[in-house]
From Swiss-Prot:
GO BP of this protein: histidyl-tRNA aminoacylation
EC number(s) given by UniProt: 6.1.1.21
Superkingdom classification of source: Bacteria
Enzyme class: ligase
Annotated GO MF terms: ATP binding; histidine-tRNA ligase activity
Record text on subunit structure and interactions: Homodimer.
Family, per entry: Belongs to the class-II aminoacyl-tRNA synthetase family.
Pfam families with a match to the protein in the record: HGTP_anticodon (PF03129), tRNA-synt_His (PF13393)
GO cellular component terms attached to this protein's record: cytoplasm
Catalytically driven reaction(s): tRNA(His) + L-histidine + ATP = L-histidyl-tRNA(His) + AMP + diphosphate + H(+)
Primary localization class, coarse: cytoplasm
InterPro entries associated with the record: aa-tRNA-synth_II (IPR006195), aa-tRNA-synth_II/BPL/LPL (IPR045864), Anticodon-bd (IPR004154), Anticodon-bd_dom_sf (IPR036621), His-tRNA-ligase (IPR015807), HisRS-like_core (IPR041715), HisRS/HisZ (IPR004516), HisRS_anticodon (IPR033656)
Lineage start: Bacteria, Pseudomonadati, Pseudomonadota, Betaproteobacteria, Rhodocyclales
Organism: Dechloromonas aromatica (strain RCB)
Name of the protein in its database record: Histidine--tRNA ligase
Length: 429
């Protein structure tokens, strides 16, 4: 007996009822992004492995432990399923010279892959909305991206999402802070866990992001990066805060917010909630002014953020925001050979007029078909038998208005009657 094949652990099917919800969510996202002038870009889900090692950093959890990497058996090329979208987007911007003559505002929606332990809100295949800008160096674009998040939460009817901010300064400022951190943690080496000891001389900033309760007090007393920032970095950070205060967007400065990728500088931010358990970050990003040059392009200021689709959808549901399932306008019932041929012509004619039609297939009695019509959620049933087919007519029955009369109409008059009743129904609501 053959083994039943199942989806890979941590990689989930999105079934029709759920996928319809996702489509509604993605439509909202695209409309929101276009309202800020962002344009779509689509990149491959497979990229050269060196891209992520150079962009994300060799000494990061993603590169060390979480990437799905393999060697192409045909040509020996090292490839990786993308664990995040920014590196691939920057690669595309450089390869196609997109930022040479003008600023760019880009977005993408798609799958990412990380070999993590699957749990609520964390999957091995997950979906992200990524938003990236190129060519804008001031704090205004940082602030705009944060304000975009605030508007989206309002549009989605979400509350309880809090904004945390920090500044990572410039590389030379981080170098001074790094030296101070190493000295501090070496002086308290007996309090470090094994992960912190491993990171101490490679990426000590990441120690501050530890989830180990036993190290929280130690990290809270560690040297703070903001004390090492120069005048320009401080002015940039204050510029972001000023816009947020003017817009009435509350925030908390979190000196331990460092992000898990090496390419960030200056502003970093996260939107977090306590409604999703341990996986509380729903949106995160910041500036990465050195990444384009680091990957072979010309020096280009850049800023971006990403949102987890699964987490946002879970948050919408947690907040009681389940949308109504979409339903067809018409369920087309037919019986008889002539009626079946007429049904195809009628269905296509109604679709030509923008009416959504679910046409019955598979035969069955009028009674069984009408039962399916009622269960479909359709507003109307259009009924065609051989008698109606012979005279070019059809029966129109409302499935939602109790006591309404069943009308016999010429096929050519169906669309006008349906559209008129749909408009009347919308006005009553």
């Amino acid at each position: 007996m053959s083994q039943t094949l199942q989806a890979v652990r941590g990689m989930n099917d999105v079934l029709p009822d759920e996928a319809e919800f996702w489509e509604l969510f993605e439509d909202t996202i695209r409309s929101w992004l276009k309202g800020y002038g962002y344009r779509p870009i689509r990149m491959p889900i497979v990229e050269p492995t060196p891209l992520f090692k150079r962009a994300i950093g060799e000494v990061t959890d993603i590169v060390e432990k979480e990437m799905y990497s393999f060697v192409d058996g045909l040509n020996g090329e090292a490839l990786t399923l993308r664990p995040e979208g920014t590196a691939g987007c920057v690669r595309a911007v450089i390869e196609h010279n997109l930022a040479a003559r003008q600023t760019q505002r880009l977005y993408y929606i798609g799958q990412m892959f990380r070999h993590e332990r699957p749990q609520k809100g964390r999957y091995r295949q997950f979906h992200q909305v990524g938003v990236e800008s190129f060519g804008m160096a001031g704090p205004d674009i940082d602030a705009e991206m944060i304000l975009m998040g605030a508007r989206l939460w309002a549009d989605l009817g979400l509350d309880g999402i809090e904004l945390q901010l920090n500044s990572l300064g410039q590389p030379e400022e981080r170098a001074l802070h790094r030296a101070a951190l190493i000295t501090y943690f070496e002086e308290n080496a007996e309090l470090l866990d094994e992960d912190a000891k491993r990171r101490l001389h490679t990426n000590p900033l990441r120690i501050l992001d530890t989830k180990n309760p036993a190290m929280q007090e130690l990290c809270a007393a560690a040297p703070k990066l903001i004390d090492y920032l120069g005048a320009e970095s401080l002015a940039h950070f204050e510029g972001v805060q000023r816009v947020l205060r003017d817009a009435g967007v509350p925030f908390t400065i979190n000196p331990r917010l460092v992000r898990g990728l090496d390419y960030y500088n200056l502003t970093v931010f996260e939107w977090v909630t306590d409604k999703l358990g341990a996986q509380g970050t729903v949106c995160a990003g910041g500036r990465y002014d050195g990444l384009v040059e680091q990957l072979g392009g010309k020096p280009t200021p850049a800023c971006g953020f990403a949102m987890g689709v699964e987490r946002l959808i879970a948050l919408i549901r947690e907040s009681g925001g389940e949308p109504a399932a979409p339903a067809p306008d018409v369920y087309l019932v037919h019986q008889g050979e002539a009626a079946a041929r007429q049904a195809f012509r009628v269905a296509e004619g109604l679709r030509d007029q923008g009416i959504n039609v679910l046409q019955h297939c598979g035969g069955g009695s009028f009674k069984s078909q009408m039962k399916k019509a009622d269960g479909s959620g359709a507003t109307f049933a259009v009924i065609i038998g051989d008698d109606e087919a012979a005279t070019g007519e059809a029966q129109l029955k409302s499935l939602r208005a109790e006591g309404s009369a069943q009308l016999k109409l010429k096929v050519d008059d169906l669309a006008e009657a349906i559209i008129g009743q749909l408009i009347d129904s919308d006005e009553e609501e």
